[in-house]
Amino acid sequence: IGIGAGYLFKTTFQREATSDLTGERGSLMGAIEGLLEAQYEVLREHGHSPSEAFNETVEELTQSLMPLFAEKGMDWMYANCSTTAQRGALDWAPRFREAIKPVMEWLYLSVKTGNEAQISIDSNSKPDYREKLNAELKAMHDMEMWRAAETVRELRPENEVK
């Protein structure tokens, strides 16, 4: 039995470990970080301000679209977005899938063969693991994209000074 998102589901240890590690490195964390950073960088390289690039990359995703997606699914989210968003998403999704699927296959194989578990074991076993992790997290925190996040979050209605 696996536990996920507040419910139980039937699985095996091998399937749960494989899907869990693939998900964490893939769409749940690693891939989403890479995707968001790539889009942010492209917008910045083409003259968009940090706040604008962050808003169009992360803020709208987390504040507007993901709640719709979580509530009733991708098709419902599409049906409740602008026509330009609908058409663009439907046209571009296959291109992203074609570009990303080979990386996901490579990742899955790396997980299935135990390579990803070994990387984690080796990394987590080093005496300076925590210091290196903190340095990596600080580097992420200090990126322009995440500094812009602080500015954009201050603009949310719930953060408005009354």
Task: Briefly describe each language-model feature range.
Residues 1-63:
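Internal alpha-helical scaffold of NAD(P)-dependent oxidoreductase catalytic cores
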Residues 45-162:
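NAD(P)-dependent Rossmann-like dehydrogenase/reductase catalytic/cofactor-binding core
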